[in-house]
């Protein structure tokens, strides 16, 4: 029998963290972070990491599990998230994955384990290339390679081409989980306003000092490539004013939110919930209850 899990995804600043706490309290759950930057100790403000006092006693997993100079891959996430799911389920509690790193979460859910030898950037670059192809292009390539896929659709075709391209580096296995995928969304203008406001709050909370610490500790690390930090490095180097750096940070965060939504829409079988709908939380709770009662 497959383990049932809840997955809460969506663009940055849409309200995933707050909802995950409510779901965990309502359904006796524990939360697994699905964010590639929140694994790093010391990166709290720029990653919008939930603070201990905000956790309301709910256990959280995969926060602060790496030093900023260390690497972290989708393979690491799949391995460690699977272990956390087993531990939570063994306690008769509900595993809840919450985050916005689509590559990591998709890899876990679809039962494909990304070998550590495959560079993260290579996987992302090839997936971006496939995203730009039409359905006709994808299906033509599938036919050329002689790949047989039952119930062929865009998502299955892209996944099969990734496996072929990476030379079998993705080990195919059946997913171990039955997941309900919840994707939060909001009107573009309102989401972008929330992003801009969040950046302002981060700066007030000490983002500049946190980014400078990262710049001094590990300026060329994987952690330093995250949005929220790298945009401030030119300011530290005297190549950009603070105002210009902050404007770049806000712009990059808005673009990132757009890419996140594209990923979830094209890559994962999510159900969208509009946070502007005053009844959306009630609908989420009802859908989770029905899912768990099946």
Swiss-Prot record:
The gene is miaA. Residues 35-38 are annotated as: Interaction with substrate tRNA. This is tRNA dimethylallyltransferase. It catalyses: adenosine(37) in tRNA + dimethylallyl diphosphate = N(6)-dimethylallyladenosine(37) in tRNA + diphosphate. Belongs to the IPP transferase family. GO terms for biological process: tRNA modification. GO terms for molecular function: ATP binding; tRNA dimethylallyltransferase activity. InterPro entries: Dimethylallyltransferase, IPT, P-loop_NTPase. Its EC number is 2.5.1.75. It comes from the Bacteria.
């Amino acid at each position: 029998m497959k383990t049932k899990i809840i997955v809460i995804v969506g663009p940055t600043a849409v309200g995933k963290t707050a909802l995950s706490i409510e779901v965990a309290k309502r359904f006796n759950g524990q939360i697994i972070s699905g964010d590639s930057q929140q694994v790093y100790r010391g990166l709290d403000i720029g990653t919008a990491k939930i603070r201990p006092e905000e956790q309301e006693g709910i256990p959280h997993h995969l926060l602060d599990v790496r030093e900023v100079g260390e690497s972290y891959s989708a393979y690491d996430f799949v391995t460690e998230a699977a272990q956390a799911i087993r531990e939570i389920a063994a306690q008769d509690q509900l595993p809840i994955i919450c985050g916005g790193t689509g590559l990591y979460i998709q890899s876990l859910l679809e039962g494909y384990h990304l070998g550590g030898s495959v560079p993260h950037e290579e996987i992302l670059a090839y997936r971006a290339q496939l995203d730009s192809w039409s359905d006709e292009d994808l299906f033509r390539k599938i036919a050329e390679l002689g790949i047989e896929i039952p119930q062929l659709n865009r998502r299955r075709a892209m996944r099969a081409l990734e496996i072929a391209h990476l030379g079998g580096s993705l080990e195919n296995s059946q997913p171990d989980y039955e997941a309900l995928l919840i994707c939060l969304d909001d009107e573009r203008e309102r989401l972008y306003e929330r992003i801009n406001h969040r950046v302002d709050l981060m700066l007030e909370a000490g983002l500049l000092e946190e980014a400078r610490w990262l710049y001094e500790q590990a300026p060329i690390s994987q952690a330093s490539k995250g949005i929220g930090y790298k945009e401030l490095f030119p300011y530290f180097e005297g190549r950009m004013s603070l105002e210009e750096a902050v404007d770049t940070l806000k712009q990059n965060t808005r673009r990132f939110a757009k890419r996140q939504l594209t990923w979830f829409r094209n890559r994962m079988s999510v159900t969208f919930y509009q946070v502007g709908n005053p009844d959306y939380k009630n609908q989420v709770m009802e859908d989770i209850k029905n899912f768990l009662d099946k």
